[in-house]
Every structure is written in C-alpha cells, then in structure tokens.
C-alpha cells in the first residue's frame, strides 16, 4: 500500500507541476511588469527543480509519471486566452495565476488526504509544492485589481463526442 500510494501521489504532483509550468509559459509573453515577470520565472524554475526530484523517485519505481488531464489543460488554455483577449494586462494574468494556484493547492491537499500511506519523502515534496503555489499567490497579490474590466462572467458548454466546443461569454 505504501508503494502504491507513493507512486500515485508522485504522479499527481508530476501532472500538477506540468500544468503549472504550462500555465506560466502561456502567460509569460504577456507580462509587462519586470518584477512580475521575474516572479513567474522564479516560480517556474522552482517547479522544474521539484519536477527533477519527482522524476528521480518515479524512475526508482519504474513509473513514467503522469500528464495533466487533457480536458483540464484545454479548458485552462481557453480560459487564459479568452481572458487575455478581453483584457491583456498584468491584472488579468495575476487573476489567472491566483485561480490556478488555488486550484492546485486544493487538489494537492486532497491527494495528501487520499494517499495517506505514501512515504514521507513524497508527502514532503507535495507539501513543498503546495507552499510554492501559496507563495506565488502571496507574491502576486499586488498585481490583482478589482477593476470591472478585469472580471467578467463566462460559461463554457462542451459537447465533446463530435469535438465541438461552444463558448458563451456574458
């Protein structure tokens, strides 16, 4: 049970890191503020360091890791691009990053609870990843804005059997 939970927890961290790095990559070209840019790059570098640690452990268990859920990755890409089209600003990027980090923290805590039998090293990596996400949220708070232009309601409907996606904005 320990080995099984350890592998499952490491795989979820692996997928989460890949999702986080991809999300940062999606927005870096749009960041205007140099401090904000450096903050995101530093966070990405820290994610990459944790990814290396995870890969070493996954290799030890002869596991290839896990890719992010394609649906989640696609929805994230759509949300990012729609919001940036509506308002290409550091405030929008900070809002997107904050939402992503909060979702990551929530998911990682659920996995810690779910895979209680995982070894301490994998739990430690998960906790460090959670702290990294929480730190980014704190570091970018100054870029958040309450401006009306930065917030809009949106609703996504998908019909995926025939690969059709309809996006409604209001």
Q: Across the structure, where does each feature detected by a protein language model lie?
A:
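Membrane-interacting alpha-helical segments
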Residues: 1-7, 61, 147
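Alpha-helical bundle segments that constitute or directly flank the non-heme di-iron/ferroxidase center
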Residues: 2-31, 92-116
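Alpha-helical scaffold segments that form or flank carboxylate-/histidine-based iron centers
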Residues: 5-13, 34-52, 90-96, 121-132
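A structural signal for well-ordered alpha-helices, especially hydrophobic packing surfaces
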Residues: 21, 51, 55-58, 79-82, ...
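Short, flexible helix-adjacent loops and helix caps
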Residues: 25, 29-36, 59, 63, ...
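Carboxylate-rich helix-loop segments that flank metal/cofactor sites and access channels
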Residues: 52, 56-95, 99-105
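Preference for long, well-ordered alpha-helical segments
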Residues: 97-152
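N-terminal amphipathic/hydrophobic targeting modules at extreme N-termini
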Residues: 149-166
